[in-house]
């Protein structure tokens, strides 16, 4: 029975029983505690907890699930998968244990003609929670199971939760006996290889708290109603119904293995365990990668993006270990599409994008693997030569930091060479790097990293932001901070306030000044005293949020004095705010235009907007074409000129998303959100920033450029409003100047410049040819005039200026070839560009037999010209910075050879 038929029978069975069929949710949900959806019931959690009323009493679904904690076990065993499909039926206060058991038993044992799976009832076993006598009784009544085929187990096995606080309850697992060839008799407590778990019925009745293990957590109490949550692994039941040994032989994964075997020209499952592991890694990870990309994840360096990157890189490396050097990821994605397409049509519809992203990661990683592998081989060899068995944390960190090697890849490669890795040392270096980054960020934001001084004010309540409605507000100073420390409350004229010339932070109870967030930088403005302190005035240079609720104004006190408790006037610079709103609204316009031109997968990855300028980062593989860039600019400006109304309103998060409002991926939002709408459906986003009231106020938007800022992430930069006009005026002036200099009309400038560039390149080529011909002539003369020191022929010569290291390597090979087979050494040094002094040394085999090493001689050159160098016995090179030492350097080489040749 094919997998798509297995899925259809499951859904049909429960729909006939009155359940509502619910589509699979994305594997990514807006839950900061959950990296990926890992169970079928996740999308129903609010119903189980009583937080929302379910629109149906019972439901059925087949949910895409991803679990990655056991990623290193994938392939080594045949039981682990990172992606799986969980078929489930759910009851929200409707039926309970009896109903769940009756429905499951019917589907498993009914004949194929009756819509069931036709399993042999005599081969079905179950387990129950150790004190669940009711479940034992029901299995006996409903299914007629004998007591010996109902086994009791503890909390770790038969009490289910998601692993985080939420719904939980005792469970009953259903197992199928695969026969004596898979293990000993005695039920699942004896062998879970022979007795394969195919279905788990969870009697969801409690709520759990925090915990550290599968058994160590507190039961908080009963749920508002008793629920049913069941999960049948589609891959597991397919294994049984297709009568194969493991999930890798089902119709879901075997096609991927066959694709790999065809390309590798090696058979799978012929007794080579290491190769079989690689086949299984490729099959599992390719499928998971396709699902992740399909659901909007792009390769990255943290979070979900890092998981995807790690999966793809394990695929690529496993393929190389199978002898596949050619690109294969595109073929793998196509095979996954063909195998999974009947169940997940989005993999077919979105295949071009999925394949493009996966192949781009393959291309990038191949470059990383080539350079990083060389370093790994060097450090592994060095470690072994020293007699050590552990690769240092420092080396692992260098591989990660410089070459992008995940620690997991280093661990795998080390294990293959018989080495361990100092993971503790590596993680300490990583933690130190993160600490430095955090400290730098905190220092940039607050000039100090300790935010505990603000705790009292944070606990007292939030700053009221008035800036959506007014640019000037009366406020009270709640606190004054200097260098991260709160200034004690004092009276005016008493030391301790904030006086003229000081740089301090003021916390107000209300403010119209926008605090940096959402990509929009902080407002600039003033804070002025009132009444007896009206002489006080401060310029606001930055505004930041503490704990998302407290506005901290960084100010320079220009006159007078501020004291905690003072009433002040906080005001935004109107010109600044006007520019800021243009920049932020322009960002929304560009985002909408990108999605219109490229499609909905151009997902925002970050932004920055300030008066007159915007920067927008988005997930996309490969550069935009000139036509696409022009289109984005045109669509943006057409929307600006359309004078769309900009409307802002608050809405419940679920309703806002249902309306199509775009949320920033990975961002955590409150239940009630602010929605910014521009031109009805043209742009609808969740946003807490300040905006223009109609799009015409944005002014022209000029895209400056589009570039890559990382694998799979592109950046668009643009000028907005007056800055756009100024930029265009500069461009016009530049073009006019070029046209005047070239004595052609403006429209002919590009062709004339192209012609000049072509002529210049031809001239440079000819100059280079003449220069190298001259150098080679000098090399011939140098070889002819080689001096003899003992029985060694030596060419030690200063070359003409402007020579590069590459030039010297080329010449040194020519000269060495002309010196014959007797002992010979060539040392060349030159004055390079920008005061560099490149040098190179070569020693032929006969010279090496005498003990002359090029890498030793290059050190003699390095000392005299204050340089560094290295290489091997036959060829070494380096570069110095003191051209006055060139003659001394050559003399040092002559002296060293004289010593070795024992001359004089």
Curated annotation (Swiss-Prot):
Protein name per Swiss-Prot or TrEMBL: Alanine--tRNA ligase
Catalytic activity: tRNA(Ala) + L-alanine + ATP = L-alanyl-tRNA(Ala) + AMP + diphosphate
Gene3D superfamilies documented for this protein: 2.40.30.130, 3.10.310.40, 3.30.54.20, 6.10.250.550, Bira Bifunctional Protein, Domain 2 (3.30.930.10), Threonyl-trna Synthetase, Chain A, domain 2 (3.30.980.10)
Entry note: cofactor: Binds 1 zinc ion per subunit.
Stored Pfam families: DHHA1, tRNA-synt_2c, tRNA_SAD
Keyword Translocase belongs to the record: no
Gene: alaS
Cofactor: Zn(2+)
Function per UniProt: Catalyzes the attachment of alanine to tRNA(Ala) in a two-step reaction: alanine is first activated by ATP to form Ala-AMP and then transferred to the acceptor end of tRNA(Ala). Also edits incorrectly charged Ser-tRNA(Ala) and Gly-tRNA(Ala) via its editing domain.
EC number: 6.1.1.7
Top-rank taxon, per record: Bacteria
Keywords associated with the record: Aminoacyl-tRNA synthetase, ATP-binding, Cytoplasm, Ligase, Metal-binding, Nucleotide-binding, Protein biosynthesis, RNA-binding, tRNA-binding, Zinc
Organism: Mycobacterium tuberculosis (strain ATCC 25618 / H37Rv)
Subcellular location: Cytoplasm
Broad enzyme group: ligase
GO annotation terms (biological process): alanyl-tRNA aminoacylation
This protein's domain notes: Consists of three domains; the N-terminal catalytic domain, the editing domain and the C-terminal C-Ala domain. The editing domain removes incorrectly charged amino acids, while the C-Ala domain, along with tRNA(Ala), serves as a bridge to cooperatively bring together the editing and aminoacylation centers thus stimulating deacylation of misacylated tRNAs.
């Amino acid at each position: 029975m094919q997998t798509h038929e297995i899925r259809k029978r499951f859904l049909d069975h429960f729909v006939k029983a009155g359940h509502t069929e619910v589509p699979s949710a994305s594997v990514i949900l807006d839950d900061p505690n959950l990296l990926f959806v890992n169970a079928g019931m996740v999308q129903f959690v609010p119903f189980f907890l009583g937080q929302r009323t379910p629109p149906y009493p019972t439901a059925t679904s087949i949910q895409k699930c991803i679990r990655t904690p056991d990623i290193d076990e994938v392939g080594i065993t045949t039981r682990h998968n990172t992606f799986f499909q969980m078929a489930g039926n759910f009851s929200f206060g409707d039926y309970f244990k009896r109903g769940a058991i009756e429905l499951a038993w019917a589907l498993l044992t009914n004949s194929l003609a009756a819509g069931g799976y036709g399993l042999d009832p005599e081969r079905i076993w179950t387990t129950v929670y150790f004190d669940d006598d009711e479940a034992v009784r029901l299995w006996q009544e409903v299914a007629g199971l004998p007591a010996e085929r109902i086994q009791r187990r503890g909390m770790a096995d038969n009490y289910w939760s998601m692993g985080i606080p939420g719904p939980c309850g005792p469970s009953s697992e259903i197992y199928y006996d695969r026969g004596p060839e898979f293990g000993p008799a005695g039920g699942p407590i004896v062998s879970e290889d022979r007795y394969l778990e195919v279905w788990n019925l969870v009697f969801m009745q409690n709520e759990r708290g925090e915990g550290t293990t599968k058994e160590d957590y507190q039961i908080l109490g009963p749920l508002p109603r008793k629920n049913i949550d069941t999960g049948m692994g589609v891959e597991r039941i397919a294994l049984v119904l297709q009568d194969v040994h493991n999930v890798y032989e089902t119709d879901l994964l075997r096609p991927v293995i066959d694709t790999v075997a065809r390309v590798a020209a090696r058979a799978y499952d012929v007794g080579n365990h290491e190769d079989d592991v690689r086949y299984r890694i490729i099959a599992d990870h390719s499928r998971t990668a396709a699902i992740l990309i399909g659901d909007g994840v792009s390769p990255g360096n943290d979070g979900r993006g890092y998981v995807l990157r790690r999966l793809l890189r394990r695929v690529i490396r496993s393929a190389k270990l199978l002898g596949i050097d050619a690109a294969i990821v595109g073929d793998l994605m196509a095979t996954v599409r063909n195998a999974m397409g009947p169940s997940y049509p989005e993999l077919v519809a979105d295949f071009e994008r999925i394949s493009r992203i996966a192949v781009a990661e393959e291309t990038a990683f191949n470059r990383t693997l080539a350079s990083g592998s060389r370093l790994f081989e060097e450090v592994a060899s060095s470690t072994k030569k020293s007699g050590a068995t552990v690769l240092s944390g420092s080396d692992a960190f260098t591989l990660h930091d410089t070459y992008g090697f995940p620690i997991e890849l280093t661990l795998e490669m080390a294990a293959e060479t018989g080495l361990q890795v100092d993971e503790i040392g590596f993680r300490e270096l990583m933690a130190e790097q993160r600490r430095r980054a955090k400290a730098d960020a905190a220092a940039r934001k607050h000039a100090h990293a300790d935010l505990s001084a603000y705790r009292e004010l944070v606990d007292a309540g939030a700053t009221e932001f008035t800036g959506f409605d007014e640019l000037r507000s009366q406020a009270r100073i709640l606190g004054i901070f200097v260098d991260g420390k709160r200034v004690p409350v004092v009276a005016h004229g008493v030391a301790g306030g904030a006086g003229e010339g000081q740089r301090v932070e003021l916390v107000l109870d209300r403010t119209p000044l926008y605090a940096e967030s959402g990509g929009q930088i902080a407002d600039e403005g003033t804070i002025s005293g009132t009444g007896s302190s009206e002489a006080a005035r401060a310029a606001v240079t930055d505004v930041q949020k503490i704990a998302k609720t407290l506005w901290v104004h960084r100010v320079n006190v220009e006159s007078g004095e501020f004291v905690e408790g003072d009433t002040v006037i906080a005001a935004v610079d109107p010109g600044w705010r006007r520019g800021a709103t243009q920049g932020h609204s322009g960002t929304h316009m560009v985002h909408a235009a990108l999605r219109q031109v490229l499609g909905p997968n151009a997902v925002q990855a970050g932004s920055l907007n300030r008066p007159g300028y915007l920067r927008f980062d988005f997930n996309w593989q490969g550069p935009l074409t000139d036509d696409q860039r022009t289109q984005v600019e045109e669509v943006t400006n057409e929307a600006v000129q359309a004078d769309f109304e900009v409307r802002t309103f608050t809405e419940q998060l679920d309703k806002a998303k249902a309306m199509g409002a775009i949320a920033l991926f990975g961002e955590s939002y409150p239940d009630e959100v602010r929605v910014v709408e521009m031109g009805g459906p043209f742009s609808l986003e969740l946003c807490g920033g300040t905006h223009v009231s109609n799009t015409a106020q944005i002014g022209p938007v000029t895209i400056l450029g589009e570039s890559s800022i990382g694998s799979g992430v592109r950046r668009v930069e643009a000028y907005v409003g007056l800055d756009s006009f100024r930029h265009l005026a500069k461009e016009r002036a530049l073009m006019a100047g070029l046209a005047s200099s070239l004595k052609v009309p403006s429209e002919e400038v590009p062709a004339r410049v192209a012609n000049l560039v072509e002529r210049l390149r031809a001239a440079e080529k000819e100059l280079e040819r003449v220069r190298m011909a001259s150098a080679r002539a000098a090399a011939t003369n140098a070889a002819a005039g080689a001096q003899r020191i003992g029985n060694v022929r030596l060419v030690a010569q200063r070359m003409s200026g402007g020579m590069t290291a590459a030039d010297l390597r080329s010449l040194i090979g020519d000269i060495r070839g002309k010196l014959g087979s007797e002992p010979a050494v060539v040392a060349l040094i030159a004055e390079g560009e920008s005061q560099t002094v490149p040098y190179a040394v070569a020693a032929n085999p006969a010279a090496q037999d005498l003990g002359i090493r090029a890498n030793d001689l290059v050190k003699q050159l390095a000392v005299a010209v204050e340089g560094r160098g290295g290489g091997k016995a036959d060829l070494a090179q380096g570069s110095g910075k003191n051209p006055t030492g060139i003659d001394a350097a050559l003399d040092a080489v002559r002296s060293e050879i004289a010593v070795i040749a024992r001359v004089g």
